[in-house]
Amino acid sequence: MKKIINIGIVAHVDAGKTTITENLLYYSGAIKSVGRVDLGNTQTDSMELERKRGITIKSSTISFNWNNVKVNIIDTPGHVDFISEVERSLNSLDGAILVISGVEGIQSQTRILFDTLKELNIPTIIFVNKLDRIGANFNKVFEEIKKNMSNKVVRLQEVYDVGSKAVYIKKLFDTCIINDDAINVLSDLDEAFLERYIGGIEPDKEEIQEKLSLYAREGSLYPVFCGAAAIGLGIEDLLDGICSYFPFASNDCESDLSGVVFKIERTSKNEKKVYVRLFGGKISVRDKIQVPNKEIAEKVKKINRLENGGVVEAQRIEAGDIGILYGLTSFQVGDVIGISNDKIKNISIAKPALKTTISAIDKEKNPELFKALTLLAEEDPLLAFAMNDIDKEIYVNLFGEVQMEILSSMLDDLYGIKVEFSNIETIYKETPKGFGASIMHMQEDLNPFWATVGLEIEPAGRGEGLRYISNVSVGSLPKSFQNAIEEAVIKTSKQGLFGWEVTDVKVTLSCGEFFSPASTPADFRNVTPMVFMEALYKAQTVLLEPLHEFELKIPQNALSKAVWDLETMRATFDNPIVIGDEFSIKGLIPVENSKEYKMKIASYTEGRGMFVTKFYGYKEASAEFSKARKKTTYDPLNKKEYLLHKLNAIRD
């Protein structure tokens, strides 16, 4: 059975990863000519929008063969606004290639990606690209990597005539030079190796290469390659490195079925394509696959497999490989197929922190816009959106302005809907202060429904989200009614007392009664929001604001300015640390206050400063800070208005 490696290529914008992908395919023989980003004819940027803009938006999957190893490769977006695409890709990888431009060096996005790969222990090769460009400096970038990312890096090549088209490379192991980087890193990682070296036993090249391969596959060290993908320099060395320094995927077809959905697309005929990375077992055409959290199974109608630059139809896929499955209409990105295991990584890099209103310029197309967003959200679950029940405005959560531009172009190109955005705001949340309880009895007071519901609300731990518990047995309240209550609780929690989503909350169903001839799930669905909001009102809520974890690096002469800015933005941070000729400051900062700070730093440090942020979570805002939001549904706290709306809807 052929060995398989599933790898991803990640990088900051314009580091050249799509060009690297094209050259890997070309030098491995998978394609006959190299596509170019500027000509819009690359293999992986298949969306028309990607070709027009020259950037990767959706992760693409393609394969090639090298040294009798099948390599499935995912080319991911580089812009931070498409971090959700990168996030999903990482769940499927055996290894990652992190591309850094030899001209621009380490960027904020580079640090975010590397820290995530390190945290998830994904074996990583670093490739320093664009060494043919004027201004490129490999030695400087390598020292930046050691200083700012990891000292467990090993340079495997020497490069000459950098910054010109005459640039060329020599493998260190093709010369008589014993690599000091390798000796130092291996001495740190391998006690037996260190003892022999101190004892005067000089390691040979074969031993060093064997040890480097072992520890790279564990994710303990990072091989560094270099080149210029635009002219094909360094690509064959990188191909060898993929097979030498990444672990092979498990091919245990006899184990229990285990896989993860990492991507969803639709064909021109609107047929759903489910991309699956299989970690164990096998899937064949006509197999029935259990849908997570649902009591249904769906039949696999067709399977496509990646094969040497193309896609071929197959009867089955086996452990270690990537397959494209047809017929699984209910599966979503992130769903586990079969059983979960420790290889299915729990990834959370970022969450959208901005919310905006979106509408069709031709208002009559707003219903079509809602349908189009529904289809796009199927491919990107972090594209959360909702419609205001009162004025029918549509709200969408986003990472930033570039994603907003791309979403606008996609809606125009794919669905013929021109849109406009307004009222961009930061997403806050709220959480209960204390305990609150409420009960509404059927057909009493303001409850016209055949349903009795009692709820208790209290704080949960930070980061727990919404925890729902039923203390009512299915014997006394049927499952269909209990499901309706839980669904209504989840839906109503999207807007609390301040209008923001209620989180870190424990909701307990304390009471539930029905009247056999008359009660329906709709009765419970309609009465629950009033009970929930009344209990929440008694508990009261506090505002939670989103925070970014940050690291700020600035020249020493900019320290006082940086500290003043951070204090003004309500950041909390540790004492500055001197690193060489720079100061490094780490801490937490409100998202609302730091949105434009990267541009400001670039200005006052003349491009020498670096501000790296990563979504941290939500924290209770200070008591004097308030940020209410207009309700987008009829407020169940105003029972008369809410009931009037519900009863009119029932009559209609």
Curated annotation (Swiss-Prot):
Presence of keyword GTP-binding: yes
A Pfam family per the record: EFG_III
Alphabetical keyword list: Antibiotic resistance, GTP-binding, Nucleotide-binding, Protein biosynthesis
Binding site for GTP: 11-18, 75-79, 129-132
InterPro entries per record: EFG_II, EFG_III/V, EFG_V-like, G_TR_CS, P-loop_NTPase, Ribosomal_Su5_D2-typ_SF, Ribsml_uS5_D2-typ_fold_subgr, Small_GTP-bd
Source superkingdom: Bacteria
The keyword Kinase belongs to this UniProt entry's keyword annotation: no
Molecular function as annotated in GO: GTP binding; GTPase activity
CDD domains: Tet_C, Tet_II, Tet_III, Tet_like_IV, TetM_like
Gene Ontology BP annotations: response to antibiotic; ribosome disassembly; translation
Domain spans labelled tr-type G: 2-252
Family: Belongs to the TRAFAC class translation factor GTPase superfamily. Classic translation factor GTPase family. TetM/TetO subfamily.
Its biological purpose: Abolishes the inhibitory effect of tetracyclin on protein synthesis by a non-covalent modification of the ribosomes.
Full protein name: Tetracycline resistance protein TetP
Organism for this UniProt entry: Clostridium perfringens
Lineage of origin: Bacteria, Bacillati, Bacillota, Clostridia, Eubacteriales
